[in-house]
Amino acid sequence: MSANLMMITLRLIHLIFGAFWVGGAVSVAFFILPAQRAIGQPGMLFVRQLMMGQKFRSYMIGAAVLTILSGLTMYIRYVMAGGGWAQTNTAKILGVGALAAIIAAGIGTGYTGKIGKRMLELGGQIQASGGPPTDAQKAEMGSLQGKMQSAFRIVAILLLLTVAAMASARYL
């Protein structure tokens, strides 16, 4: 594969999967999770189906991995080409954007995964009891939902900062 074709392929992977990742994170953080909290139990069932049944979480993780790996590969190829590119403002700004994306991926896969697992466990306990949730279960679920929404907002903001860095890097 020629160098140009390789870079075009990497760039397409980076842009397409990055757009999906950012759009998904922003949608979940600012629209889906707030709506889920507002409507209560039916909203929780919807989010569970979205994340587990429709495998949205898996697709988001896959998009994050492909976006980061393709971006790092392009970055390394530019650095290896020499010419002092790594010392330019463009390279530094792209590096900051990459770091923000990597942090977002860590929060989005690690921290939210732990919260989601506990939410599923608690939901299963509530369902198995056959009755309404106890006050303690309601309080814990509310706390978990708040943490999940906050984490997704942080992820979304980090990814929007990443997009801003990527879009402006060559002009600064």
Which residue ranges define each predicted feature?
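Polytopic transmembrane helical bundles with strong interfacial aromatic enrichment
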Residues: 1-172
